[in-house]
Amino acid sequence: MVTTNAPIITLRDVRFTYDGGATWALDGVSLDIRRGERICLTGPNGSGKSTLSRVIAGLVAPDEGYVVLSGNVVFDESGAHADEYRTARCGIGAVFQHPEDQIVTTVTEDDVAFGPENLAIEHDEIGLRISGSLDAVDMSDYRASDPTRMSGGQQQRIAIAGMLAMDSDVLVLDEPTAMLDPQGRADIMRVLDELQDRGTTIILVTHHADELEQDRKSVV
C-alpha cells in the first residue's frame, strides 16, 4: 500500500441538506483522505453515507463547508467552483448503488469505453483498457452483449469495469458488491486490493463486516 502524508481529499465542517435545512444529511463532517488510503464509510441506513460519497466524488456540492478534491478547492465560503469541480472529476471514478443508472449504451464494450473517450484517451489505449477492465470483473465473454438486458449483478460488474477503464487516482464505490454472490464480492475486493497496492485512493461504502479490515480506516 502506497500512502503519502498530504491529503488528496479534505472536508471541513461540511453540511448538506435535501429539504432546505429542516434536516441535515451531513452536519459538520470533517475528513482527510490521503493518497493510497482505503476509507470505508459504514453506518445505518439514512446516516448520510451515500450523500458523503457523492460529495467526495464531486457529484454534488454541499450547502456549507470547505472541500478539496484531488488538490482542487471545489467549495469554500464563496460557494462552488465549477472549473475546479470539472478538473477534479477527471481523476475520480465512481460506482453507485443502482448500476442500471450508469449503463449508457446497448453494447458492453461501448459502455466501458464511455469514460475513457470523454477523457480523450487514444483509441488503441481505450481498447486495451476495455479488455483489461472486463477481464478484471470476469465479463470478457459479454463484450458484445447488451448490458441493458443483463442481471443486476452483471450490470454492477459492467459499471465497475467502466470505472476501472478510466484509470482514476481516486475511486468512490457505494455498495459496489451489493448484488454479487460471495465469490463475486471476493473477486472485486481482490481488484481493489491490487489498485490500492498501486497507490489508488479508495472510498468504499459498505455494510459487509469482512470489508472492514484492520488496515483500512473506517468512518462511522
What are the residue ranges of the model-derived segments?
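Helix N-cap at the start of a conserved alpha-helix in ABC-type nucleotide-binding domains
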Residues: 182-184
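Helix-to-loop junction immediately C-terminal to a conserved catalytic motif
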Residues: 57
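Conserved ABC transporter NBD signature motif
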Residues: 65-77, 88
